[in-house]
């Protein structure tokens, strides 16, 4: 059975995409990707279509995520 997991924040450009990325990284390390369906979303539509915040992307890269 696949577990569905949704990370939610206000704009979906910083916190929830970061949480999604960290979780995906962890399940990949443990070879569990086939057991989870992971996504992120925002409660507001201000940033629809925008990539994750560049500072968050840089922080994730520094941590190997």
UniProtKB/Swiss-Prot annotation:
Entry's family note: Belongs to the low molecular weight phosphotyrosine protein phosphatase family.
Matching SMART domains: LMWPc
Entry keyword Hydrolase: yes
Gene3D superfamilies reported for this sequence: 3.40.50.2300
Protein name: Uncharacterized protein in rpcF 3'region
Assigned keywords, A-Z: Hydrolase
The organism of origin for this protein: Synechococcus sp. (strain WH8020)
GO function terms (MF aspect): protein tyrosine phosphatase activity
InterPro entries: LMW-PTP, Ptyr_pPase, Ptyr_pPase_sf, Tyr_phospatase_low_mol_wt
Active-site residues, record numbering mapped to chain: 9, 15
SUPFAM superfamilies found in the cross-reference section: Phosphotyrosine protein phosphatases I
PANTHER family, per database record: ACID PHOSPHATASE, LOW MOLECULAR WEIGHT PHOSPHOTYROSINE PROTEIN PHOSPHATASE-RELATED
């Amino acid at each position: 059975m696949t577990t569905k997991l949704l990370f939610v924040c206000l704009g979906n450009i910083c916190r929830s995409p970061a949480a999604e990325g960290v979780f995906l990284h962890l399940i990949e390390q443990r070879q569990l990707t086939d057991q989870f369906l992971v996504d992120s979303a925002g409660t507001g539509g201000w940033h629809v279509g925008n990539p994750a915040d560049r500072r968050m992307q840089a922080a994730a890269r520094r941590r190997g995520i």
